[in-house]
UniProtKB/Swiss-Prot annotation:
Its EC number is 2.3.1.89. Disulfide bonds: none annotated. InterPro entries: DapH, DapH_N, Hexapep, Hexapep_transf_CS, Trans_hexapeptide_repeat, Trimer_LpxA-like_sf. Keywords: Acyltransferase, Amino-acid biosynthesis, Diaminopimelate biosynthesis, Lysine biosynthesis, Repeat, Transferase. Belongs to the transferase hexapeptide repeat family. DapH subfamily. CDD domains: LbH_THP_succinylT. It comes from Lactococcus lactis subsp. cremoris (strain MG1363). PANTHER family: 2,3,4,5-TETRAHYDROPYRIDINE-2,6-DICARBOXYLATE N-ACETYLTRANSFERASE (PTHR43300:SF10), ACETYLTRANSFERASE (PTHR43300). GO terms for molecular function: tetrahydrodipicolinate N-acetyltransferase activity. This is 2,3,4,5-tetrahydropyridine-2,6-dicarboxylate N-acetyltransferase. NCBIfam families: DapD_Ac.
Length: 256
């Protein structure tokens, strides 16, 4: 299998050096007036340019009572703005994490199908025509090959790697490992089917063409072209024509 694009030490440095942020979304009603220095334009409304320079996004019409106003940014920057309210202090705050080091992945340039509700952190690699279903959780450093499907509620831990044209079933877990940095991540080869709710333990490699049965717990490496099942998982047979037909992928699901 190919070497990973990011080593554990590189990920550790990325997290350690990252600016920690506490994202908030503030919804205001009425016509709020601010007194905070540097935040005001001459009309007493927000100075949008100054706010943007502080990483704050402001949405809504501040010239009317009748629309909601939304402020989005880091709590450290937004808090002084709220403390400067002089009237109409009617607002709610939604917090997103606390001192988070890893943002979500910007998926705009990814040539894959990613359904709403998938949680994908930054520094994740996703191949062309992959499919990420709702509820999937993919941690930093994970790699997903082209044409691979990560089904509903599946979890790929840090640095977990899945090859091309594989299927990770609903609720399955590929255990992640970022620390200790010397530990090996899970590596799943090409054309592999991991059944629903199966668990592959840290450091295990699953060879290309193999099948992991639903509910199996895989604690040892799996060779190519075999079926494993049970707790702990054991080889129950080699892949035959019947098994290959039953586990074949559907290309239409990967069309964009």
């Amino acid at each position: 299998m190919e070497a990973q694009k990011l080593s554990a030490q590189e990920i550790i440095q990325f997290i350690g050096n990252a600016e920690k942020k506490t994202g908030v979304k503030v919804t205001l009603s009425g016509m709020p007036s601010f007194k905070s220095a540097g935040f005001l334009a001459e009309n007493g409304r927000p100075n949008f340019k100054a706010l943007a320079n502080k990483g704050i996004q402001v949405l809504g019409d501040f010239h009317t009572h009748y629309s909601l106003k939304i402020i989005i940014g880091d709590w450290q920057a937004v808090r002084p703005l709220l403390e400067g309210l002089t009237e109409n202090k009617d607002y709610t705050i939604e917090f997103e994490g606390r001192n988070s080091a890893v943002p979500l992945l910007d998926t705009r340039a990814i040539n894959a199908r990613i359904e709403p509700g998938a949680i994908i952190r930054d520094q994740v690699t996703i191949g062309d025509n992959a499919v990420i279903m709702m509820g999937a959780i993919i941690n930093i450093g994970a790699e997903i090959g082209e044409g691979t499907m990560i089904d509903m509620g599946a979890v790929l831990g840090g640095r977990a790697t899945v090859g091309k044209n594989s299927h990770i079933g609903a609720g399955a877990v590929l255990a992640g490992v970022i620390e200790p940095a010397s530990a090996e991540p899970v590596r799943v080869g090409d054309n592999v089917l991991v059944g629903a709710n199966a668990v592959v333990i840290e450091g295990v490699q699953v060879g290309s063409g193999s099948v992991v049965a639903a509910g199996a717990i895989v604690t040892q490496d799996v060779p190519e072209n075999v079926v494993v099942a049970g707790v702990p998982a054991r080889i129950i047979k080699e892949i035959d024509e019947k098994t290959a037909q039953k586990t074949a992928l559907e290309d239409a699901l990967r069309n964009l």
